[in-house]
């Protein structure tokens, strides 16, 4: 089978590497030459900076930064769906809004292309290990076609339903993570201000009922003053906006989402958009005049 992969960034590159191990003919695309260089000389792998070269594949994977880029790549003038073979599969691993996924699905349906929204959950280490969670939306028969490929990149592969179901599932999961991160940012500077030992407090939080993936990831890094790791705050904020759009359109009250969004907005206004979500802690540290760090 011919496979193509577009988008060789922090997540895309290790995912494509795992697909390359499967032995199928793989063509990888990126606009960045240095990203392509990682794949130069690999058996059964071709590299290209021209999207025309990836359109002969039966399955094309996308792993791109945002919905606007996905839509431009797939639907724009000279976009992929205008050049792909009828019946081929466009599988989008990117995290984009539910609305953007539905727009791409509609465009694909009009041109005879099978679309699957397949957002991934798990950070770079899991992408490298091939242990991602993949949530898939589209026709079940299309899912079955690409399921063997998805098993090369993840260990928890879930068919969630029709187009859009993958992105919606990812959003629900991501919201809980995002909200947890905002809650942590609010409480740990309070602990420091009130005289609690930060290391002991973090130990209690990560062994007690307050434990979460967010606390396990962000608290050790906060103690070291490391706020650069993890999903960029500006990208996480887009998840909150997507959820707010669904909340408004479906009349779903989400007061906790609204409160968390305000914390993200404060952090973005403070210039922390390129940092990880843990940098929200710095907002409240500055407000309270304290730091949650190792002694």
Label every model-predicted segment:
Residues 1-62, 88, 124:
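NAD(P)+-binding Rossmann beta1-loop-alpha1 motif at the extreme N-terminus of oxidoreductases
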Residues 31-32, 66, 139:
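Residues in the short beta-alpha loop(s) of Rossmann-like NAD(P)-binding domains
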Residues 52-53, 59-62, 67-132:
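Rossmann-like NAD(P)(H) cofactor-binding subdomain of soluble oxidoreductases
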Residues 96-174, 178:
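Rossmann-fold dinucleotide-binding core
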Residues 129-137, 158, 162-194, 205-217, ...:
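Active-site-proximal catalytic alpha-helix in oxidoreductases
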Residues 163, 167, 211-276:
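Interdomain hinge/lid region at the active-site interface
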Residues 269-295:
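NAD(P)-dependent dehydrogenase/reductase Rossmann-like domain
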């Amino acid at each position: 089978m011919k496979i193509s992969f577009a988008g060789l960034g922090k997540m895309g590159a290790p995912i494509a590497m795992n697909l390359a191990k499967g032995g199928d003919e793989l063509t990888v695309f990126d606009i960045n030459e240095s990203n392509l260089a990682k794949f130069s000389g690999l058996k059964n792998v071709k590299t290209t900076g021209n999207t025309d070269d990836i359109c002969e594949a039966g399955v094309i994977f996308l792993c791109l930064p945002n919905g606007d880029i996905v839509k431009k790549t797939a639907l724009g003038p000279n976009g992929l769906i205008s050049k792909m073979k009828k019946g081929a599969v466009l599988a989008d691993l990117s995290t984009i809004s539910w609305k953007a996924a539905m727009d791409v699905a509609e465009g694909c349906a009009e041109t005879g292309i099978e679309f699957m929204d397949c957002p991934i959950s798990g950070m770079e280490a899991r992408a490298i290990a091939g242990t991602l969670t993949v949530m898939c939306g589209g026709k079940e028969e299309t899912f079955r076609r690409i399921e063997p490929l998805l098993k090369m990149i993840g260990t928890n592969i879930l068919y969630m339903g029709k187009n859009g179901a993958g992105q919606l599932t990812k959003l629900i999961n991501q919201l809980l993570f995002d909200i947890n991160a905002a809650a942590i940012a609010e409480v740990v500077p309070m602990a420091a201000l009130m005289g609690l030992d930060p290391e002991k407090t973090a130990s209690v939080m990560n062994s007690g009922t307050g434990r979460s993936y967010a606390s396990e990831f962000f608290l050790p890094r906060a103690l070291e003053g490391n706020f650069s790791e993890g999903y960029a705050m500006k990208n996480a904020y887009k998840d909150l906006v997507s959820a707010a759009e669904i909340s408004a359109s479906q009349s779903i009250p989400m007061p906790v989402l609204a409160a968390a969004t305000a914390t993200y907005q404060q952090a973005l206004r403070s210039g922390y958009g390129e940092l990880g979500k843990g940098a929200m802690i710095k907002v409240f540290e500055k407000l309270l005049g304290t730091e949650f760090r190792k002694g």
